[in-house]
Amino acid sequence: MAGIGFELKKLFRRKGLFATLRAYGYAGVICTGPMLLGVLLQVGMLVLCGWAGAARADQDLLVCMVTYTLLASLTVTSFFSMPVTRFLADMLYEEQEQTILPSFWGSNTLLLVGGCAAYGIFLIFSGATLMQGLLCLWLFAEMIVNWNAMSYLTAVKDYRGILWAFVAAIGISFGLGYLLIFLLGAPVLEGFLFAITVGYGCMMLLETLLLHRYFPQSKESPWTFLRWVDRFLPLAFTGLFTNLGLFAHLVIIWAGPIGIQVKGLFYGAPYHDVPAMLAFLSILITTVNFVVSVEVNFYPKYRAYYSLFNDGGVVGDIV
């Protein structure tokens, strides 16, 4: 978060209403931009489906397939997220950047092999057609790389790079979806699912290019990070169970009395999902205010206090 704080402190030093609005706007875009863009993608695709005259069942199935794929990929990558972040912090501190990019490909390999096998089995019994299943599996593989790349880009504080990668993915998805459905007459469900997959594929390429810009390619072992996973195994399970805690209630609600079976193993709960999305949007202002208060007001005092311990401060200054 230090990268955000540095930019915010520069913006908040400027006086005037426009400067304040710009500072809050920057914090909002950086902190909530990817989440907002994800919501925008879902809502925008539903609007385009409505314009294309798609059946309500196809619209619900598209939302379920994309949601299931995103949540499944996020859950798989959450196991490595915290240990990899610790590995990155140690390597950057020790100035061993040559080990970072190989670890990215090594972690991707393990996540893709295990994740695609598990999600592929789910898709076989999910009731999806062969084309729908292949597109979902393709999107799942891309999102594993995307979530993993975001952990690496966050470590180097390239929040703008992450945001612009999301913007590019959304724009390409909308543009390609419109081209396929309205101009070429492709099937609505498969056309939009393909457009979303291509959009997130472009996002994956952009994030990979950003990583190559920051870190050198080398012949270091791609499995070095596994020592950190073994050493900090509780962190791995913390990340996994935190993610399960965030999203397990969705599965319970989808399988509960208010859930509806969209198709096969794909379930949804419109009476819950829509209010939940609105509730999520309502807390964004609080999230932005929290980030601003922590980075601009709290963090400078926190850093000054602990620097007294690390840099030989006297007792009088500390107390």
Where are these regions (language model features)?
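N-terminal membrane topogenesis motif
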Residues: 1-41, 60, 64, 223-235
